[in-house]
């Protein structure tokens, strides 16, 4: 009984992951750079599936009189065999793109597709991330960059945590693939989020680092 339950849980996790990947691929093809698409989030409950589309220009995602998002909702219901009325789409605005790894990975992808040199594109992304208040960042581009042999280029700045629970709390990570004429490039963006207990900085982490000591005057 326990083994069958475990298998069903594994199948559910795999099915959810495949559904998320297919949704992300669908929206990536549907939206161009004008909407600033930066990923999708799923919230499932019995009888209802909420799909949150993250973008920098939500008005372009919704469309006039919410027509575009309604068409997308019906498209998702038909393509993934959902019953009518069981899927709801929302558009969420990204207020601080500099601290969103998905947004920066998509921006780097568009720069590379436009023919910008890898070093120039990556340094522009690193500069944009650090000027928005990040404590550190790392951009990795791997694949056939110039020569026939594949290689990896890393661009770092600031302070980065690589292991432990703080790496899960403070690091925002995104991975994308760029199809170019010479081959496919892999793009990885990792951002070390700043700590903000007042929650005034959009995209910052409100969990204090365990190794940081704050001295307050009595």
Swiss-Prot record:
The lineage of its organism: Eukaryota, Amoebozoa, Evosea, Eumycetozoa, Dictyostelia. Belongs to the universal ribosomal protein uS3 family. It comes from the Eukaryota. GO terms for molecular function: RNA binding; structural constituent of ribosome. Keywords: Acetylation, Ribonucleoprotein, Ribosomal protein, RNA-binding. Residues 23-95 form the KH type-2 domain. CDD domains: KH-II_40S_S3 (cd02413). InterPro entries: KH_dom-like_a/b (IPR015946), KH_dom_type_2 (IPR004044), KH_sf_prok-type (IPR009019), Ribosomal_S3_C_sf (IPR036419), Ribosomal_uS3_C (IPR001351), Ribosomal_uS3_euk/arc (IPR005703). The keyword ATP-binding does not apply. GO terms for cellular component: cytosolic small ribosomal subunit; extracellular matrix; nucleus; phagocytic vesicle. Pfam families: KH_2, Ribosomal_S3_C. The modification N-acetylmethionine is found at residue 1. This is Small ribosomal subunit protein uS3. The gene is rps3.
